[in-house]
């Protein structure tokens, strides 16, 4: 007889099936609701120039190959309003039609005033008219490359185009193929921490808004007094966030989809150099400024291209906050980045997306992969494929229960946590059979021992039950306090049917005597712990 466990949500969530996508929070955890139920974005972002119909045939097979359920793709201001006041949504309609045909959800990336801080995706009539749409001024009074967030003319033009975009979605996407929107992209300014124009300087010398000093617990004063060496950057963060918040409010008034902004990061723990960072963007140390300045934005999110495991963990820690749902809208598509999917799940992430996932022939190494060969693609396809079969159920469980995840650290050491009565440890670089402490049975090192692969994620379903997924990992479940009566009662491989866990087979003997070992075939397991009396 099949062993079953039911995962359910409280009625107030389950009853919202006719509502559009939205993000909800409970007990410090978050869920993206799509069609009324939690949804985990197993996403992939295409290259920057794949936002044309001619490129789409090189996109869908790649998404299918890695079992992605969501595409992140740009729609550029220059693309929909090449002539001021004349809008063309041909590509957007093509995208909607093809996404539906390929059973993919869509996250639209609005490349407008800022794309990686640049105005490159603005229409020609914007980028060539510096009087009407002014750039920032440097300390020396010269034009900088980035548009200033102080210009009402630029804001109104961007907002008008964005509202037209959202209006088109309202009229042509009632089924919510598009589930989320990213207004702008990696905002801010490099090598110039703020606008130094006369108008901006006057604002800089005024008192910091009281709402911000109150939130930060700082005394009143002007920007220099309150923020010291980071004053220019704090100022630019505030006004950039206010600019985008107004765009988001206008767009949501038409169609209230969840909206997030993404951050070009500047190191996981250092205080950034205002002239070296994308000043104005939502880096982790200015998140509180963004939260006060832009309450309409649902999340600030990290774009992660740092390969170091310690740094990735710090970024995930910083952005997974009770007031900020975690999603990773961009991460490198090199093979070693795939392991961080598990750590993101362990932080309760609502989405994860390697960048540059299409077959157009462009690779952004050294940020990402040198090539999308089979081993690279399989590193993402394996975890995505395992979770895809339980995607809704995992998302529900992660919203209702504690989670933990670990990626193989760069030093190959163990990772562990305690959930309730049980200690969970992830070990790496071992064969599936036997113990590394054995001296009587010789073995060669596991081929993957030196490779940056492997990880696991768990959800604690009840006091003694866990849902887990992983690859290239040995998982050990033990009592948090030594207890000779404690044991693994059962390890089940299975699936969900209508929200109920159905056991396909029980792992026992060699499959559990040396920990729970998963190598190159990620699977979802239910682990039941207990004690005999």
How would you describe each model-predicted region?
Residues 131-287:
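Polysaccharide-binding and catalytic clefts of secreted carbohydrate-active enzymes
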Residues 16-69:
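N-terminal carbohydrate-binding accessory modules
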Residues 431, 435-458, 463-533:
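C-terminal beta-sandwich/jelly-roll accessory domains of carbohydrate-active enzymes
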Residues 49-65, 275-293, 311-312, 338-341:
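Short, acidic/polar
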Residues 342-477:
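Aromatic- and carboxylate-lined catalytic core of secreted/periplasmic carbohydrate-active enzymes
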Residues 104, 246-257, 285-393:
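Catalytic-core region of carbohydrate-active enzymes that cleave or remodel glycosidic bonds
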Residues 36, 71, 99, 165, ...:
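Conserved, mostly hydrophobic/aromatic
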Residues 56-132, 240-256:
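Aromatic-lined substrate-binding rim segments of carbohydrate-active enzymes
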């Amino acid at each position: 007889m099949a062993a079953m466990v039911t995962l359910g949500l409280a009625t107030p969530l389950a009853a919202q099936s006719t509502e559009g996508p939205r993000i909800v929070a409970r007990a410090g955890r978050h869920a993206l609701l799509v069609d009324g139920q939690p949804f985990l974005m197993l996403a992939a972002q295409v290259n920057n120039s794949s936002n044309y119909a001619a490129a789409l045939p090189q996109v869908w097979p790649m998404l299918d190959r890695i079992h992605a359920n969501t595409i992140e793709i740009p729609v550029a201001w220059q693309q929909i309003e090449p002539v001021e006041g004349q809008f063309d949504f041909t590509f957007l309609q093509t995208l909607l039609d093809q996404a539906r045909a390929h059973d993919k959800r869509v996250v639209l990336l609005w490349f407008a005033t800022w794309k990686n801080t640049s105005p490159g995706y603005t229409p020609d009539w914007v980028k060539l008219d510096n009087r009407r749409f002014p750039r920032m001024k440097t300390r020396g009074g010269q034009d900088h490359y980035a548009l200033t967030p102080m210009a009402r003319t630029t804001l109104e033009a961007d907002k008008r185009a964005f509202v037209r975009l959202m209006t088109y979605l309202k009229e042509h996407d009632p089924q919510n193929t598009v589930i989320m929107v990213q207004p702008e992209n990696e905002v801010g300014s490099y090598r110039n921490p703020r606008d130094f124009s006369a108008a901006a300087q006057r604002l800089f010398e005024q008192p910091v808004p009281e709402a911000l000093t109150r939130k930060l617990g700082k005394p009143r004063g002007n920007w220099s007094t309150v923020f010291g060496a980071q004053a220019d950057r704090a100022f630019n963060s505030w006004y950039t966030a206010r600019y985008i918040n107004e765009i988001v409010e206008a767009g949501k008034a038409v169609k209230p989809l969840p909206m997030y902004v993404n951050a070009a990061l500047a190191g996981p723990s250092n205080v950034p150099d205002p002239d070296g960072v994308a000043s104005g963007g939502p880096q982790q140390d200015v998140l509180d400024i963004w939260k006060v300045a832009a309450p309409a934005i649902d999340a600030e999110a990290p774009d992660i291209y740092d390969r170091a495991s310690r740094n990735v963990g710090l970024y995930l820690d910083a952005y997974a906050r009770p007031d900020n749902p975690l999603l990773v809208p961009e991460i490198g598509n090199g093979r070693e980045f795939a392991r961080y999917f598990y750590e993101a799940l362990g932080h309760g992430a609502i989405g994860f997306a390697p960048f540059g996932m299409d077959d157009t022939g462009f690779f952004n190494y050294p940020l990402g992969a040198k090539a999308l060969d089979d081993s690279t693609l399989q590193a993402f396809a394996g975890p995505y494929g395992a979770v895809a079969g339980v995607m809704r159920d995992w998302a529900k469980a992660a919203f209702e229960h504690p989670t933990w995840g670990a990626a193989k650290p760069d030093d190959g050491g163990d990772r562990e946590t305690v959930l309730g009565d049980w200690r969970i440890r992830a070990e790496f670089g071992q064969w599936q059979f036997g113990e590394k402490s054995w001296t009587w049975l010789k073995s060669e090192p596991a081929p993957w021992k030196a490779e940056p692969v492997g990880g696991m994620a768990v959800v604690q379903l009840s006091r003694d039950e866990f849902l887990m997924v992983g690859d290239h990992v040995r998982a050990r479940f033990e009592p948090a306090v030594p207890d000779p009566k404690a044991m693994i009662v059962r390890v089940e491989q299975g699936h969900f049917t209508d929200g109920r866990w159905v056991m396909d087979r029980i792992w026992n003997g060699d499959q559990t005597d040396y920990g729970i070992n998963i190598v190159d075939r990620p699977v979802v397991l239910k682990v039941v712990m207990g004690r005999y009396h």
